Structures are given as C-alpha cells and as structure tokens.
Design a protein with these regions (language model features):
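Short alpha-helical segments and helix-capping/turn motifs at coil-helix boundaries
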Residues: 96-104, 177-181, 237-241
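Conserved thiamine diphosphate
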Residues: 1-34, 160-163, 187-243
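Thiamine diphosphate
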Residues: 113, 120-216, 238
C-alpha cells in the first residue's frame, strides 16, 4: 500500500481534490453513451416494426428466437419422431444416434448453429442440412479447425448474442484444450451444447493419448453444468431434448 501520506502527496501533484471513491460529474458526462445507445435502440425498433409489416412470419420467428423459446409444437413433433426412430432401435454408436437426432432437430430448429474442431466426420455433428458458414455465404455449420478453445469461446459469444443455440464437437480427451471457455459458459449460465465423442477409456486406435480418464469427473464437478452420457438411441434423444429445453446452464454431452 502507498500509505496515507504518499496518497495525499499524489492527490496534490495530480490536482485531484475529490474524496475517495468520488467520480466527478464531468467524467460521468464524458463516458455517458446513452444518447448513442438510444439511437441504436431506435434504429433496431424501427427495423423490427418494418419486418412485422412486411413479413409477419419472419418477425414472429425472430421474436421466438430472441425470447429463447422452442416452437409451439416442438414437444409433440419430437415425441412422434422419437416413436418412429425407436421402431428401428438398432444398436449403434451413440455419436451416430446423435446424428440421427440432429437430422430432425436441424430441420425444425433454425436457431441451431453446429460445428466441430476438425472432427465433423468422427463426431457426427454435421447433417444432411448442414450448410458451412464461409466468408461469402451464410449457413448453419462452422468448421472451426483444430482449435478447441477458440471453438468454445466462439460458441459462448454466439450464445451471449442471443437468438441462436450453438453446439459443436470434439473428442472428449481434447476437452482440456478448451476447458477455460467451458468453465466460463457454466459461470455465465449460458446456453451452449458441448458434444464430446469417443469417451471410453478403451476406445480408439490412437492409444492412451486419445483415451479420456479424468475428463468426465472434471466436467461433472463443474458447478452449473449439466452432463449427459447417453448409452442408447433413446438416451441420446432425451439428452438432446433436455439440453435444448434447459435455459440457464450449458450442457456437455458425450457420445
């Protein structure tokens, strides 16, 4: 600590006559951005009103997305879908089961933005209706490259923006590379779905470097995070549904 005498001398040298924790009105005025913010808000409200007039259907969709609500008939449609796929409940890897569920979800939820850290073919996070986002075209799927932390942090940003639900995958053992962003998602209580495949200690041909041991314990002990480890097509489908309807916590799924 500087000490009271040094602080007093510093105040005199800086010509700072204000008391402790006092902020002068001039500084408040210089930092006040309410006028600029009001302009942005007015512009946004005008665009929303224009959209409501010109395209009520899109305006209704926008309102639903920004309010983080699922479609009105989502529950009933999902139940029908579930009954149908369970008629052919063959034993398959849960990452493939996850892809089956995603095929339905992506066709019914335009707010889903998928991706993977260079493992789309292994995680099965892409679907027949996945359109890659590039610098020149819109889409609903991001090829993040080999950068797990960047991927997770970007998903956090997408979620914080609102209106979209991000999900993306990598191998469970690579969770460590993006761990801080996963923890931040839990800390902020935002809606992000982390998909981790190849979660068995004995799975894969790459040996112990790709076989997770402590990772499940780490994620399960993270406060404010749901962890689903599905073991069948039914459990995978239910895990996806509960991940989507839960608003205030990120979800981490293994497949």
């Amino acid at each position: 600590a500087l000490g009271s005498e040094i602080v007093k001398e510093l105040r005199e040298n800086l010509d700072w006559p204000y008391s402790e924790f006092e902020i002068p009105n001039e500084i408040y005025a210089d930092w006040d951005a309410s006028d600029i913010g009001q302009k942005y808000e007015d512009d946004w409200n005008e665009k929303v009103q224009t959209l409501k007039s010109e395209n009520p259907e899109k305006a209704e969709l926008l309102e639903r997305l920004l309010n983080e609500k699922l479609p009105e008939k989502f529950d009933s449609n999902f139940s029908v879908f579930l009954e149908e796929i369970l008629k052919h409940n063959e034993p398959i890897a849960t990452r493939k089961a996850s892809q089956k569920v995603l095929e339905f979800l992506k066709k019914n939820l335009p707010e889903l933005i998928g991706g993977s850290a260079d493992l789309s073919g292994s995680n099965n996070t892409n679907t027949s209706v996945s359109n890659p986002i590039t610098s020149s075209q819109n889409g609903n799927y991001i090829y993040y490259g080999v950068r797990e932390f960047g991927m997770n942090a970007i998903m956090n940003g997408i979620s914080l923006h609102g209106g979209l639900i991000p999900y993306a995958g990598t191998f469970l053992v690579f969770m460590d590379y993006g761990r801080n962003a996963v923890r931040m998602a839990a800390l902020m209580g935002i809606k992000v779905i982390f998909v981790y495949s190849h979660d068995s200690v004995a799975l894969g041909e790459d040996g112990p470097t790709h076989q997770p041991i402590e990772h499940l314990t780490t994620l399960r002990s993270t406060p404010n995070m749901q962890t689903w480890r599905a073991a069948s097509l039914l459990e995978t489908a239910v895990a996806w549904k509960l991940s989507l309807i839960h608003i205030s916590e990120p979800t981490r799924r293994t497949t």
